[in-house]
């Protein structure tokens, strides 16, 4: 297709306007691929002025011919209300068609619809199943959400180690948002907490790879993302709890920072650490803060 050649610069200088022109010619002749690509041009403003209504028009024509990519985008338009009135039921209808053809984007968004009950009855098991299908295709966002399913037991048996496995796969595929570092460090802390409950020694935990990894991911997050707010600042509590096994002074510093940010439950963590510090050393710092 000439449009693809100009769009990708395949043997010719890249030219999105020329690509859109050739897509239009083929689309007018009923080519479903060209109709999809022309819709995408309008959706993203590639080679033409962005126009959601025209995007929907061409996505619809292509989707009616069974094009899975167009079906996904048409479903997304209904889901977001872009170029057409928001309609969750219609969104699900088109996402389902695309998902059945193996479109990973559609499987992921359809899973979210089932998870939230948008256009369908809420069904966490079906959501987890769809996230799994997309995740198996390497879809980074689906892998992140599948990690969440394993972390919280949403529609699937809770398994913190599988959660971490899928979080890491998501990162391998380019998902580098703050919440994935936050999630990994918190799940590792949960694993450490379970280790302590079954009698693992303090010294063994302090030397564990789980502790080292938890600190590594959490410290990366605070150094590379804006966590200086009450919502995301809970990662400082995670760091404080992790450092409880390694360095009480640093644990106290992180807990105090969480308190300063107004993080929920930070005061409880700080008091617990001050009690521990009063038991194991630095009694002056313990006494100065325990009655705050």
What name fits each language-model region?
Residues 1-8, 37-44, 73-80, 109-116, ...:
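Hydrophobic face of amphipathic alpha-helices that form TPR/SEL1-like repeat modules
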Residues 8-10, 28-31, 44-46, 51, ...:
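Short helix-capping/linker turns of helical repeat alpha-solenoids
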Residues 33, 69, 105, 141, ...:
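Start-of-helix register in tetratricopeptide repeats
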Residues 245, 257-292:
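Terminal, low-structured helical/coil segments at or just beyond the last alpha-helical repeat
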Residues 25-26, 61-62, 97-98, 133-134, ...:
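Canonical positions in the second alpha-helix
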Residues 164-173, 206-212, 216-221, 248-264:
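TPR/TPR-like (Sel1-like) alpha-helical repeat modules
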């Amino acid at each position: 297709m000439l449009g693809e050649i100009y769009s990708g610069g395949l043997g010719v200088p890249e030219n999105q306007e020329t690509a859109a022109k050739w897509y239009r010619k083929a689309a007018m002749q009923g080519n479903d691929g060209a109709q999809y690509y022309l819709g995408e041009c309008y959706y993203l403003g590639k080679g033409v002025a962005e126009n959601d209504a025209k995007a929907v028009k061409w996505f619809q024509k292509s989707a009616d011919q069974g094009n899975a990519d167009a079906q996904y985008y048409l479903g997304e338009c209904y889901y977001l209300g872009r170029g057409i009135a928001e309609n969750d039921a219609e969104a699900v209808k088109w996402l389902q068609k695309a998902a059945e053809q193996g479109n990973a984007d559609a499987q992921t968004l359809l899973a979210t619809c089932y998870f939230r009950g948008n256009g369908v009855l809420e069904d966490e098991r079906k959501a987890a199943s769809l996230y799994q299908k997309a995740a198996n295709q390497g879809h980074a966002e689906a892998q992140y959400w599948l990690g969440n399913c394993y972390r919280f037991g949403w529609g699937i048996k809770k398994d913190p180690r599988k959660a971490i496995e899928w979080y890491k796969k998501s990162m391998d595929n380019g998902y580098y948002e703050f919440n994935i570092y936050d999630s990994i460090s918190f799940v590792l802390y949960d694993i450490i907490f379970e280790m302590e409950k079954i009698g693992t020694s303090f010294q063994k935990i302090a030397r564990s790879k789980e502790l080292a990894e938890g600190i590594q991911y959490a410290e990366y997050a605070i150094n590379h993302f804006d966590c200086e707010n009450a919502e995301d600042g809970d990662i400082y509590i995670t760091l404080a709890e992790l450092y409880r096994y390694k360095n009480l002074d640093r644990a106290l510093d992180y807990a105090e920072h969480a308190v300063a940010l107004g993080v929920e439950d930070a005061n409880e963590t700080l008091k617990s650490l001050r009690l521990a510090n009063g038991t194991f050393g630095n009694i002056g710092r313990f006494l100065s803060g325990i009655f705050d």
